[in-house]
Amino acid sequence: MGDYVPGFEQRESDNRSFGHSRLPTLGAIPIKNEKGQTVMQKVKVSRYVAGKAPEYARNYDSDSSESDRETDRDDDRRRRRRRESSDEEDRRRHRRHEDYGRRRQVEKPEVLGKVEDESSENEQESEEDEEKQEERRERARMRRLELHENNREKDEEQEDSAESDEEDFERRRQMLRDRAIKREEEIKREIKEELEEDDVEEEEEEESSEEEDSDEDDDPVPRLKPIFTRKKDRITLQEAEKEKEKEILKKIEDEKRAEERKRESAKLVEKVLQEEEAAEKRKTEDRVDLSSVLTDDETENMAYEAWKLREMKRLKRNRDEREEAAREKAELDKIHAMSEEERLKYLRLNPKVITNKQDKGKYKFLQKYFHRGAFFLDEEDEVLKRNFAEATNDDQFDKTILPKVMQVKNFGKASRTKYTHLTEEDTTDHQGVWASTNQLNSQFSTKRAGGSRPVFERPATKKRKN
């Protein structure tokens, strides 16, 4: 790629002699090819990728790259040692803090004598309070120091992570996040323990003051160190009585529930018995003759008799059909042998018998036609003898009195017809398009009509072709 840069993109910093040449910001630049022609060539934008050397840095000597790698390795080792030392310091500080938290000693029960001087006790209590306050201040100071060191370590680790690659950065960030979460949990736990200790100390002070009041008697009484009991573990006489009352009420409710279940079960048994008795009564009332039901246990004699009856009916039906066919054939032969006059006289004296014969009725004006049908008319049926020409629905009205426009079928509907009926239309009109003589009709008749096509062939040639 050439070093040509358009004039309107020229900058003072582009004329530098050090480093890689600045790439133009256009999508394509004009360059000269091998033939000397000026053509446009696309600019390949080189993007920065973490951990990958740029294009202009690949031509350097291998010695310098190896030395750079060694320095990078040394830097990584230093950072790793620094992190390990900081982690070890954190663990040591955490261990010291835990030991300090466990430093509170549990004293054994002791026999205390009678308090003689109240002023000495008050001074001792004030000294103990000051020691506790000093311990709290020391713990707070330690926490502040730890937070300050943690923040400083976070800053150092962030600087180190910015120099390393993305994987190390992610790993260190996760470690820092886990460490911060652990520290927050430890701080919360310490605060909670301190609050519990304060509560315990206050309760112990109250109990000790009560015991001191009770110990003002003449005879000294040995006293044990009071033990703190949680509120949920404390049981008083009132609570014990309430628990007994609850148990008694629960027993009474259980007894009532058991009695209700007994009554419900008795009602259910009674209902089932009644249903069984009703079913038995229905069986006795609706008892049928089981012999009328066909089963597979019939005897062979009964099956044979039934088959014999069916076979006799079939033979009789076939014989009647043969006799009827023979009679019709004989009658046809007789009619064919007669003369025309004899045939007319015979048909007049012996008319043909038509089953379900129906007289054709008269249809009204614009009445809808229904066809009776043509099948299964050889059997006598009252339905087939009805008058199918009888008007129904709208056909019962006289449509001759309607205006001429309304004398069409389905008037006012999408399926209405244009014409009233065929008898009112003139079908002999020769003025239509199909009857007029034009070029299209003449061409059609010339090509398709027989004998009208011009033929310019000699008969002799036609014979030779054949």
Swiss-Prot record:
Residues that span the membrane, as ranges: none
Biased composition (Basic and acidic residues): 58-77, 97-117, 133-155, 169-192, 234-245
Annotated localization: Nucleus
Composition skew (Polar residues), residue ranges: 434-446
Extent of Acidic residues compositional bias: 118-132, 156-168, 193-219
Keyword Nucleus applies: yes
Disruption phenotype: Developmental arrest at larval stage L1 or L2. RNAi-mediated knockdown results in aberrant splicing of tos-1 mRNA with increased intron 1 retention and exon 3 skipping, leading to increased expression levels of tos-1 isoforms 1 and 2. However there is no obvious recognition of the cryptic 3' splice site in tos-1 intron 1.
One biological process term in Gene Ontology: mRNA splicing, via spliceosome
Principal location class: nucleus
Keywords in alphabetical order: mRNA processing, mRNA splicing, Nucleus, Spliceosome
Quaternary state and interactors: May be a component of the spliceosome.
Family per record: Belongs to the MFAP1 family.
Protein function: Involved in pre-mRNA splicing.
Record's protein name: Microfibrillar-associated protein 1
